[in-house]
């Protein structure tokens, strides 16, 4: 996928916004550039779906939002986390509160390394994932990454009562 972007860098600018699973990536950029990209993808018979989003998330076009976030986050007093946190920027464990602040800012312009994050967690002993909130998108992505892990979704109060850990 990156090769396709590199080959066409003079025709349009698009960045990988999400690496969700093998065969599923999300690209981000200006609408006009994404339209050109869609044309290229269709000509190569590569399946694509234009997502209805309000901004070019997780790419360099979010620079202004990054600066706003930087100013706001620096005002906050974070505490060290008692639980392990995995950054979607690095797909690795966040080591301390200062790194957490930096990564929360960086994630605005950088791609989400979902697939790598899930692999990191599995390789470090996580074998049960619980998705909280409407839908099952993340659960589906996790199952595409590794069918052997246990997954649950919690959408209702009864889902909580039925949850078996």
Question: Which role fits each region the language model picked out?
Answer:
Residues 1-144, 152, 158-165:
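Acyltransferase
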């Amino acid at each position: 996928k990156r090769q396709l972007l590199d080959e066409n860098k003079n025709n349009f600018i698009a960045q990988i916004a999400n690496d969700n699973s093998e065969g599923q990536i999300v690209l981000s950029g200006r609408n006009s550039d994404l339209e050109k990209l869609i044309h290229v993808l269709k000509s190569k018979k590569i399946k694509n779906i234009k997502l209805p989003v309000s901004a070019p998330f997780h790419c360099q076009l979010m620079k202004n939002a990054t600066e706003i976030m930087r100013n706001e986050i620096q005002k906050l007093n974070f505490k060290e986390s008692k639980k392990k946190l995995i950054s979607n920027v690095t797909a690795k464990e966040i080591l301390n509160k200062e790194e957490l602040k930096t990564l929360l800012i960086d994630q605005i312009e950088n791609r989400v390394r979902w697939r790598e994050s899930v692999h990191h967690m599995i390789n470090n002993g996580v074998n049960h994932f619980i998705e909280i909130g409407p839908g099952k998108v993340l659960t589906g992505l996790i199952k595409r990454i590794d069918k052997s892990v246990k997954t649950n979704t919690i959408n209702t109060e009864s889902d909580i009562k039925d949850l078996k850990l």
